[in-house]
Amino acid sequence: MPNEPVLDQVDRLQRSSRDVTTLPAMMSQWLSTVLPGGATPEITVESGIDSTGMSSETIILTARWEEDGQPVAQKLVARVAPTAEDVQVFPTYRLDHQFDVIRKVGEITDVPVPRVRWLESTGEVLGTPFFLMDYVDGEVPPDVMPYTFGGNWFADAPVERQRELQDATVSVLASLHSIPDAESTFGFLADGQDGDSALRRHFNWVRSWYDFAVPDIGRSPLLERTFQWLEDNWPQEAAATEPVLLWGDARVGNVLYRDFHPVAVLDWEMVTLGPRELDVAWMIFAHMVFQELASLATLSGLPEVMREDDVRATYQRLTGVEIGDLHWFYVYSGVMWACVFMRTGARRVHFGETEKPDSVESLFYHSGLMKRLIGEDQ
């Protein structure tokens, strides 16, 4: 069938057309305006776009300068907003919001986040905004190829250690969701959004994200039916709860680990305010998607990881809060994953890696899962 998902080159994702050879000089000049004493550092680019993210550019570099007569060497990570020409995943990128959230989370919680250093919000230096944070050494369960495919440190670990990592990652959500009065502390995250609740505002944003994706890759009847399903089954009780700070892209692939424990929580592009069920469901659903990918590749994956009952029990033990039903939030997560696949698919078409598909739904590796969740036959 032309609209069935095909596991095609999941190991290849073109991310950016940026020429990193021009970056050292530009970064050195800009850093001289923010470093103590106006020092002009020597910049070495250690690596370009990393192997985990699919949205903002992640560039690792080392800056060397003198401070008070002493040599300083600091390894840094630049998170750079993509250009529109690179077919960005999201309609807009608020690097300033990400910077402020990471800084505040580091100040008021025990969640391990990198130290953020400097923000350039105008886009005048590199063409788009960026911020710099300290480099943190650690391991990430890979997205490419998906960790459920095996042959990586997480998939090959004993079940007990996998569970240890899972529980430690759920504890990140517990800490974030326990920040008091998140609406006040992080109210800037709701700037410019319309809706009578945090969830409604987020839902409206997701719908606009889908509308943003359509012109480059085509409409999805499945997603449009799913949007209607979400409206028809709106979770009134969850929507009425006090919003918490949501990490957004809450999954193991966005954490650096050492010895199976988080040392840096990364990728805050989807950070928002809303019901805690959204983060919890997203973390579980992300693993469901990777399980679907493994199934398409005729692999067993990791069925013991991120089981809902286990995640619920850990979360309740850590927070004292029993989360509500997650079914609606799984469906909602599926819509957002589809929007990501629409944009990464459009990006591959843009960079000549593949032909534009006859049906956008051939890009939805999780379409079978989505149909099951909304009660449609496959």
Kindly label every feature range from the protein language model.
Residues 245-247, 252:
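Catalytic-loop of the protein kinase fold
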Residues 321, 325, 336-378:
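Helical subdomain adjoining the active site within ATP-dependent kinase catalytic cores
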Residues 266-271:
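Activation of the activation-loop gatekeeper triad in protein kinase-fold domains
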Residues 1-43:
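Juxta-kinase regulatory segment immediately upstream of eukaryotic protein kinase catalytic domains
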